[in-house]
Regions:
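C-terminal accessory helical subdomains adjacent to catalytic cores in phosphodiester-
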Residues: 1-4, 15-38, 51-66, 70-197
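Helix N-cap/beta->alpha junction signal
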Residues: 10-11
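Eukaryotic endosomal/vacuolar membrane-trafficking regulators centered on PX-domain-mediated PI3P pathways
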Residues: 38-48
């Protein structure tokens, strides 16, 4: 075996976030994980439709396979996150990974993980010390927030905040957030599932 974990993701931002999360193995209460992260060339739809085919190539090289993609943009938005996860897990398991695979689908998309109440989010986004505060600004801009204080349109809210702060949206931002924001602050069901895998 070449490693512990092969992870298939839809884009570079998810790749950077997952790499940062895996570096924080003490916070995950696990040993260091020998992982390889690959990006599907067909993004979210490719992960959903063909992820099992790509992962099949690695079944003799890694102990566990993980597939991550966004519900929004995957081509099956009418399905729930849990329905999509179940179907994808069944498909991957039947392709040779039975008992050694997991699927995490961000809902609606990866940026939902960005929005915790940590001041590190404001710092990474370039909003530290600004008035009004980031969440108040989002509401003033018309971004509806959930009861947990997360925007219903997390990607659009992040992009708008970065534009105002004149900070580029980059993979480095996702990695920085993954490395600095406390895991206990993220109560998103998909993130909790990722921590438990």
């Amino acid at each position: 075996m070449k490693g512990d974990l092969i992870v298939l993701v839809p884009d570079r931002n998810t790749e950077a976030a997952v790499a940062g999360i895996l570096e924080r193995h003490p916070s995950l209460h696990t040993r260091p994980v020998a992982a390889r992260i690959i990006v599907h060339p067909e993004k979210d739809p490719g992960c959903r439709l063909h992820g099992h085919e790509l992962l099949r190539l690695y079944q003799n090289d890694f102990r566990f396979a993980l597939l991550i993609f966004d519900r929004e943009g995957c081509g099956a938005e009418e399905s729930t996150r849990t329905e999509l996860e179940r179907l994808a897990e069944e498909t991957i398991a039947s392709s040779g990974w039975k008992g050694r695979c997991g699927v995490v689908i961000t809902d609606p998309e990866l940026e939902i993980w960005v929005w915790s109440d940590s001041p590190r989010v404001d710092q990474a986004v370039g909003w530290l010390g600004r008035r009004p505060g980031l969440r108040e600004w989002m509401q003033r801009q018309g971004f509806e927030l959930t009861s947990a204080g997360k925007p219903l349109r997390p990607k659009e809210a992040l992009e708008a905040a970065l534009r105002v702060a004149r900070k580029p949206r980059s993979s480095a931002l996702y990695r920085e957030l993954a490395l600095k924001v406390g895991f206990e602050r993220c109560l998103d069901p998909a993130f909790i599932k990722l921590k438990e895998l």
